[in-house]
Amino acid sequence: MKIYTLDPRCIPAMEKVREYYLSIPEWQKDIREGKMFGVLIYRPAPALYGGEYDVSESGQYEVTGSPISSAKDDGAPGDEMTSGDALSYLAAFSGTLGGKTCQPGFVPPIFDIQGEGRYFLEEEAEISAINHYLDSGKASAREVCDLRHERKERSRALQRWLFARYSLLNVRGDSANLLDIFSPTIPPGGAGDCCAPKLLQEAFRRGIRPLAIAEWNSADNKFYPPCTHRCRPILAHMLQGTDAEADPELTHYQDIASRLKTIYEDKEIIVVNKPSGLLSVPGKEFLPSVESITQALSTHRLDQDTSGLLVLAKTENIQKDLRQQFAQRAIEKTYDALLEQEMPVGKEGVIELPLRPDIENRPRQIVDHEHGKSALTHYRVIGNINGHAHLLLTPETGRTHQLRMHCAEGLKNPILGDRLYGTREDATSQTLRLNASAITITHPTTGEKMRLTCTPEWLGSQD
């Protein structure tokens, strides 16, 4: 079942849906601004569970209002639906279309906020009334405090009420709501309202076996895979038991995560060697991270592109102790780096350039002597490898991208493979040659001074 790559058999259905929504004048503002649409193609067949599937029902949400063959098995456009040789489809839009959650020709929402969810709209209106009163300036200082607390609690309760009502099926008939699926985090706004979850929900509700799903944006008519921020955790549940193709991005990061190695572990701490490309802590894309894999608590971070040693705690008290050591600069760290150009062996010095985020070009950082935060790095050139200077870097501060910026701006010699600050055209296709190779900590329980080391993977394979 294709969902992350376009199945050609979906194209005729996509064209029929596009022809349909372009014919409705009331929808054209949404269409011009860009609305996600999707189709799910299937072959009418006996249900996977719950009895026989009634083919006559398939027209209920189809664009024409009657069963239509969107493609034959060989990918060619079909004619009328006949037994065994033709496909049909379901269609969906994300969020609302023409200001409504339900429209003829499309599957219904998983939870209809404009119908059965009227309580949400009424409670939302009352919370908005609190906002208007606070903005009016008529509230006393005591009222402001009380109303802000009330607004926060009611908003939180309303959000949980809504998420609990999105009950999502999978092919096995199992159901889970958004709170269960995203636990322990809070689901993002709009979760469950994208095309793929809506299509799968209707298919499983009716016992349809999906063959493929395709989504596209009406603004550019290009195919897009399901979004990661809202859909990845949902699809992990809904696609259980299907033959759906693997999420290629997730598979890629799982391959990277498999290279995570434990350097040291006891009852209080765990020290790992993080490969380049693996997140230190969970992000918005719900990809594997060191924290999620080890089920330990982060005490510091490495950039996603940086490899090397990370120290994690197994309890909150140990985490607090180690974070305090980092804050007090009691922990020593040394990095190996290969730079784009050669440098004289034995050269050493200190780079001190204040840094701040480049607000208009995140996640890049920039040097700012007026508003930047102090950043200091010691460096020493210990050799040249295949035309690239090999440095040992010892930071005294821990600013975002500090070592990358200090090499690029302070030494005018970016780190090899730096896709943000590098000058080589092939930087984006290379591994960042920056590795946290040594760290010295005081064990939170024993008080023992511990020095742990690792060797960069890339030292043995240079361009």
Where do the protein language model's features map onto the residues?
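RNA pseudouridine synthases
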Residues: M1-D463
